[in-house]
Amino acid sequence: MLKKLTVVMAASAAALMAATSAGMAQAKLKWAHVYETSEPFHTSSVWAAQEIGKRTNGRYAIDVYPASQLGKEADINQGLSLGSVDIIISGSSFAAKSFPPIGVTYYPYTFRDADHLLAYTKSDVFKDLTKGYEDKTGHHIVAVTYYGVRHTSSNRPIKVCADMKGLKMRVPDVPAYLAMPRACGANTAPIAFAEVYLALQNGTVEAQENPLTTIEAKKFYEVQKHIVLTGHIVDHLNTIISGELWKKLSEEDRKIFTDVMQEASAKATGEIKVNEAKLVDFFKQKGLTVTEINKDEFRDTVIKTTSFESFDYRKADWDRIQAVK
């Protein structure tokens, strides 16, 4: 009888210790972004959150907050330092507010195409720039997702740079995003991403710029007449882990987070490429006019009017990116 009691007590203690350990070990994390639930950036984030839970045996419970639920893009970047979010997806243009050199990728016509961008993410110059960001902020860029080539949508036809003169255009309040529109004479307005559709609809602005996939997902095509293939920025998003969380992760968990997030970014990148290829025909079917432009003319205008130093970029970094094959 005593032996049985001892066995039962030992088993109960072991179960209690296991339950306590599991309870103490599980961390609840917040992952935030500004994109719609239908977009690959969200679906891949949800997959990654679930996969991290599986691979860590439930030590992490990650909730994903899409569509600016935890704030605009500037807010969630600030949230990494405030501790209100643990993981975000965000462009290097926002990272550049803390470490300007990393924003050089947004200088218009830096990348030839998506493959050039993806090759850059495996280069030494990428490692140097992301390390500079981490040294400045403590936050760790763990993965990069292709966002798409940024083009212009407008209610005014645009065939040459000068056609943009006086155009009321929504552009994010990011110096490099502003470079091409301002070089061509547009009047820019920094309207929040969540408010762009209404601003286009009510005429507050006549135009905006984004990848084709975003123009489709946010339904901007419903309130625009023209798609102009300016192709001025080959854009990307960073998956960033807060410095506070990164410090707490064991080496084993760092590897799991990194592997899963890079797998997720590869999934989203693949989807974006496929979707992007279909959208020119989609917009034509919706009755929009799609216009090709001479990119050399636009690029030359930007280079003549916009210095790297004015953005606190380093031309040496840009030259290194140009050399990436």
Model-derived regions, located:
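Bacterial N-terminal signal peptides that target proteins for export
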Residues: M1-M9
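Bacterial N-terminal signal peptides
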Residues: M9-A18
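N-terminal secretory/targeting leader peptides
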Residues: A10-A11, M24-H116, V125-D128, G132-K325
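Sec/Tat signal peptide C-region and signal peptidase I cleavage site
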Residues: M17-A25
